[in-house]
Amino acid sequence: MSITPEEKARLMKEFATKEGDTGSPEVQVAILTSRISTLTEHFKSHKKDNHSRRGLLMMVAQRRKLLDYARAKDEGRYQDLIKRLGIRR
């Protein structure tokens, strides 16, 4: 249900704003989006896993907060991010 360290490193490299960037909203949203999509696939075969569903809802809420922050800081970067990730908004 979690993402591999290689996948996480790839996302950090792809969405980083500068070398060694691990904490920018873009990187955090990309990692959360990957984890959310992994959990969504998990729920297709484990419909009654409510414990993990709670974790999914918390991840979605955290991503929403980070996206709101990114939008408030720089609308252009926000639009680019949701386009690159394919997030509906």
From Swiss-Prot:
Molecular function terms, GO-annotated: rRNA binding; structural constituent of ribosome
UniProt keyword Iron present: no
Domain of life: Bacteria
GO biological process per UniProt: translation
SUPFAM superfamilies in alphabetical order: S15/NS1 RNA-binding domain
Keyword tags: Ribonucleoprotein, Ribosomal protein, RNA-binding, rRNA-binding
Any one GO CC term of the record: cytosolic small ribosomal subunit
PANTHER family named among the record's database cross-references: RIBOSOMAL PROTEIN S15, BACTERIAL AND ORGANELLAR (PTHR23321), SMALL RIBOSOMAL SUBUNIT PROTEIN US15M (PTHR23321:SF26)
Protein purpose: One of the primary rRNA binding proteins, it binds directly to 16S rRNA where it helps nucleate assembly of the platform of the 30S subunit by binding and bridging several RNA helices of the 16S rRNA.
Assembly with partners or alone: Part of the 30S ribosomal subunit. Forms a bridge to the 50S subunit in the 70S ribosome, contacting the 23S rRNA.
Record-stated family: Belongs to the universal ribosomal protein uS15 family.
The protein, known as: Small ribosomal subunit protein uS15
Species of the source: Jannaschia sp. (strain CCS1)
Encoding gene (name): rpsO
